[in-house]
Amino acid sequence: MAIFGVKVADRPAVQLNIGQAGTAITSARAAVQAGCAETDARIEAKITPTETDYLRQLGYSVTAIRLCDEAMRLLLRVQGGNGLREGSSFERRYRDFQAMPLHINAHPDRVAELVGKHLLGVENNAPFQ
């Protein structure tokens, strides 16, 4: 596809945004893989997770979601108005993705508060169970 005779892939802003989105997705994947590796190792060693373990796992997932959100926003920027007007499935997927972190287990405000309290040694009124 070309706009004003220049291929979209040849535009520096497209390259920049795609590059940043790719890096964000790679980092999100690394966070998830690190969390899964920790969980697998704990299961293999038959170690019951502590509150610290639980909160670190929540942190991995919230970080991965945040990085994927950043990637989605960058890809939306690349699509621009023409991409949205042409009606690909991206807009629906973007909207659906926005609902994901609103679920209580992945809600960034909830997780950040719990992790912050734990790191500061403040009593948590919703203790790990």
Question: Which residues does each PLM region occupy?
Answer:
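Generic structural signal for well-ordered, non-transmembrane alpha-helical segments
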Residues: 19-26, 58, 62-69, 95-98, ...
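Short linear motifs at secondary-structure transitions and domain/linker junctions
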Residues: 2, 51-52, 127
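C-terminal helix-coil-helix/basic helical segment that borders enzyme active sites and/or dimer interfaces
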Residues: 27-62, 73-84
